[in-house]
């Protein structure tokens, strides 16, 4: 900064000397002119030499440039401080930084070079490696959409509608059949029969239940048509299958955590969206009539991410659409102090709000079933 100031002062000094020389030259030329005018009225006015004018313009341009672009001391000081501390701090809101780290965005791929290198280490124009687990590791760490590859995805050798097991690559999973999954995970919906799906959402055993027939009646009474929905964390697509039988199209978001959830959804003739809960839903604004949040949406999601998630649901819901929280799990104190106020920020109408204690609760855990309707106009 001191060198810059010295250079500026030197230029100003040179400019001042040159200006004085030019002024003296011009003054002497003007005096000679008046003297010659007395002697002869026909004498012509002498002009300033071009090389002096060019030098003067050059000096003035340099002075203007330096004075115009000279950085303000306070600005330069703050800029230098920001440059020094950029690696340790930021002026961006903390919640935005948290979300940028947790929410899957493609730019996060560079944060995991080892996993990314392993994912992209394949032979072009051949079969893709068996790396389903690696894919989900990258997705959950923010590397989604995944980089494109020039290899062919693996498929079952002899798929058959009559044999559900033949539609799954079982090498990824501990169980090797749907019977194993039904026995090991009886409550996760791997019984793909339609009657099983219908019965799961038709019974009313407690205040936490919301049968589909009641849901459709509520919508009909409000003159609200249900045509398109999304089941967030919908597992094997049981809810989507039950709604399909009632001519309602429901997309299911799911992840294959040690079981073929996406394959199970597809075998029902439904669409599985292989996305985590943190991702912005790949759906246009204001086009969905219903969003159901299953048991995957609960208190284990970080609070800040949960708030972004709710507002993304609001983004895709149309005015008059419904948000259904089906057995949202949390501690009672957290529901009252954190989640209920967070949900209240949406400004939705409470059509149903039922809270019940967890049967074997030891720390005050509760379940919430809520049906909320988005305002028609903000």
From Swiss-Prot:
Matches recorded under PANTHER family: EXPRESSED PROTEIN, S-ADENOSYL-L-METHIONINE-DEPENDENT METHYLTRANSFERASE SUPERFAMILY PROTEIN-RELATED
Record protein name field: Probable methyltransferase At1g29790
Chief place where the protein resides: Golgi
Single biological process term from Gene Ontology: methylation
InterPro entries assigned to the protein according to its UniProt record, in alphabetical order: Prob_Methyltransferase (IPR053223), Put_SAM_MeTrfase (IPR004159), SAM-dependent_MTases_sf (IPR029063)
Gene for this chain: CLSC5
Membrane topology: Single-pass type II membrane protein
Uppermost EC category: transferase
